[in-house]
């Protein structure tokens, strides 16, 4: 790689040579220190100036230099800032030589005594300094140097150094995932890991990534869902299971979609769609309570998570909106209706597909407050149980908040004969051009033949969930390293 260095970058490399001539180790292997900056502030910030002077608290710490001015440095570590005072007349010559060669971005070790300045700022009066890692790049200015969104994503490590709000987002993401685990662990769910590489495509409607498994001389898919192996575990006697893991869908990128994302799927024996709606609502409210959030501001909307989540039947909502009865519509009339509203009817479409397209066109945009939409057509729900009152529809629901879908749940289909027929229908769709349709998974059908107890299941996209609770409108803002086009 031919790297053209800026003037500042050249100067910093020249400083390395000067430091080495002074016998300074430029890149240390490790160092021991007393307290990190956060702990120092927590422990000593309440002390008065006189208390610190009287007791002479000596300690060492480390951090990245973010400010150099006169006789002061400001260090940053783990999101906190801490001032260092350099008593130039008292410091040993070797430390003065080191100070002259320090730059913003360098990581250093400092030992000294705690004090407070005239303005009351907790400060470490240095008596020893050590360079731990020399920064050869110039950090961008927080307000003017890192405004390009693509550059922020491409150099996320720099983004994290200079933008505190970005750091807070990812700390909160980690906390949300921990809360999800806490919620399900407290309910005695078992966390499991299932294979990322799958020989059969299934568990969701999505285009896959395909890879070659050399040892088996076969093509495998990167999983598009964890549903089928998790339900096999319920067959095997684990009544409550969940998995948090990476999912891969070879599809487009937009503000709410990334080809690689994190999801949680959870399954509970002797539950159903109603039970999953209740469980999912309780999970969202649990997270909000733990984060001390009563309302959420997202995508320009104020979301109230305290109230009971609304329940809305998909077809009944459309019937009211369009003034027709979609329960009784013929396929020919459905195609005419689709054409009227500029919906492309694919070769594999049936009435259920058109109903779903109409829902996405007319209803989704109005689903602001938390709403469970239920009663999905069987054609788009190959793994969900048929509704007893109308077998053309299923006991399935999706949770919408702020016009976005966050969770998909249903009463699981436990009948292996029906499941095989549904898989065959999916395969027929695939043969007729639906790249997102499932393949026939005979191994899963065999698992059902051993007996799957009545089961409810749900999947949630964790990245979207984090977007909701951090008020970020782009999924890239909640992914540490989002996928980007090559420069």
From Swiss-Prot:
Please tell me whether the keyword Nucleotide-binding is annotated for this protein. yes
Q: What is its EC number?
A: 6.1.1.6
**Which sequence ranges are marked TM in the entry?**
none
Task: Name the residues that bind Mg(2+) 1.
Answer: 398, 405
User: What is any Pfam family matched here?
Assistant: tRNA-synt_2
Specify which residues bind Mg(2+) 2 according to the UniProt entry for this protein.
405
The organism's superkingdom is given as Bacteria
Localization per record: Cytoplasm
Catalysed reaction(s)? tRNA(Lys) + L-lysine + ATP = L-lysyl-tRNA(Lys) + AMP + diphosphate
The Gene Ontology biological process terms listed for this entry are: lysyl-tRNA aminoacylation
The record's remark on the cofactor is: Binds 3 Mg(2+) ions per subunit.
Major enzyme class: ligase
Q: Which GO terms describe its cellular component?
A: cytosol
> What is its cofactor?
Mg(2+)
What Gene3D superfamilies does its record include?
Bira Bifunctional Protein, Domain 2, Nucleic acid-binding proteins
Q: Which InterPro entries match?
A: Aa-tRNA-synt_II (IPR004364), aa-tRNA-synth_II (IPR006195), aa-tRNA-synth_II/BPL/LPL (IPR045864), Lys-tRNA-ligase_II (IPR002313), Lys-tRNA-ligase_II_N (IPR044136), Lys-tRNA-synth_II_C (IPR018149), NA-bd_OB-fold (IPR012340), NA-bd_OB_tRNA (IPR004365)
- Recite the UniProt keywords alphabetically: Aminoacyl-tRNA synthetase, ATP-binding, Cytoplasm, Ligase, Magnesium, Metal-binding, Nucleotide-binding, Protein biosynthesis
The molecular function terms in GO held by this entry are:
ATP binding; lysine-tRNA ligase activity; magnesium ion binding; tRNA binding
In terms of PANTHER family, this protein maps to: LYSINE--TRNA LIGASE, CHLOROPLASTIC_MITOCHONDRIAL, LYSYL-TRNA SYNTHETASE
NCBIfam families in UniProt: lysS_bact, PRK00484.1
Subunit composition?
Homodimer.
Q: Which family does it belong to?
A: Belongs to the class-II aminoacyl-tRNA synthetase family.
Q: What is this protein called?
A: Lysine--tRNA ligase
The uppermost taxa in this organism's lineage are: Bacteria, Bacillati, Mycoplasmatota, Mycoplasmoidales, Metamycoplasmataceae
């Amino acid at each position: 790689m031919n790297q053209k260095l800026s003037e500042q970058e050249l100067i910093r490399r020249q400083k390395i040579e000067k430091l080495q001539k002074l016998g300074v180790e430029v890149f240390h292997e490790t160092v021991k220190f007393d307290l990190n900056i956060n702990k120092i502030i927590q422990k000593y910030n309440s002390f008065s100036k006189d208390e610190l002077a009287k007791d002479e608290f000596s300690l060492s710490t480390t951090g990245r230099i973010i400010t150099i001015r006169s006789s002061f440095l400001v260090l940053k570590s783990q999101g906190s800032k801490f001032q260092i005072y350099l008593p130039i007349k008292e410091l040993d010559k070797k430390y003065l030589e080191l100070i002259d060669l320090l730059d913003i971005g360098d990581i250093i070790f400092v030992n000294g005594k705690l004090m407070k300045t005239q303005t009351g700022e907790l400060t470490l009066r240095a008596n020893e300094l050590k360079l731990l890692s020399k920064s050869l790049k110039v950090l961008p200015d927080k307000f003017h140097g890192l405004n390009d969104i693509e550059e922020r994503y491409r150099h996320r490590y720099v983004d994290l150094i200079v933008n505190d709000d970005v750091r807070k987002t990812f700390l909160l993401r980690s906390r949300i995932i921990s809360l999800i685990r806490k919620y399900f662990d407290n309910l005695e769910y078992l966390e499991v890991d299932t294979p990322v590489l799958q020989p059969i495509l299934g568990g969701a409607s999505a285009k896959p990534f395909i890879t070659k498994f050399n040892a088996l001389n076969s093509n495998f898919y990167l999983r598009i869902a964890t549903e089928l192996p998790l339900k096999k575990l319920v067959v095997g006697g684990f009544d409550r299971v969940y998995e948090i893991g990476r999912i891969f869908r070879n599809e487009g990128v937009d503000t709410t979609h990334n080809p690689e994302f994190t999801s949680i799927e959870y399954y509970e024996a002797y539950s159903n769609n109603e039970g999953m709606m209740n469980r999912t609502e309780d999970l969202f409210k649990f997270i909000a309570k733990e984060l001390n959030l009563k309302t959420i501001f997202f995508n320009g909307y104020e979301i109230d998570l305290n109230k009971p989540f609304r329940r809305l039947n998909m077809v009944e909502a459309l019937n009211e909106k369009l003034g027709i009865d979609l329960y009784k519509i013929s396929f020919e009339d459905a195609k005419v209706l689709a054409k009227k509203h500029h919906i492309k009817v694919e070769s594999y479409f049936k009435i259920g597909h058109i109903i779903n397209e109409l829902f996405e066109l007319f209803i989704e945009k109005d689903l602001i407050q938390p709403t469970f939409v239920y009663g999905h057509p069987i054609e788009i729900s190959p793994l969900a149980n048929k509704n007893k009152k109308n077998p053309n529809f299923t006991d399935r629901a999706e949770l919408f908040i702020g016009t976005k879908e966050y969770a998909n749940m249903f009463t699981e289909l436990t009948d292996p004969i029906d499941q095989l027929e549904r898989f065959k229908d999916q395969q027929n769709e695939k043969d007729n051009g639906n790249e997102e349709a499932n393949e026939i998974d005979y191994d899963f059908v065999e698992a059902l033949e051993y007996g799957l107890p009545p089961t409810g299941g749900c999947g949630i996209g964790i990245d979207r969930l984090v977007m909701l609770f951090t008020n970020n409108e782009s999924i890239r803002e909640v992914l540490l390293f989002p996928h980007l086009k090559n420069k």
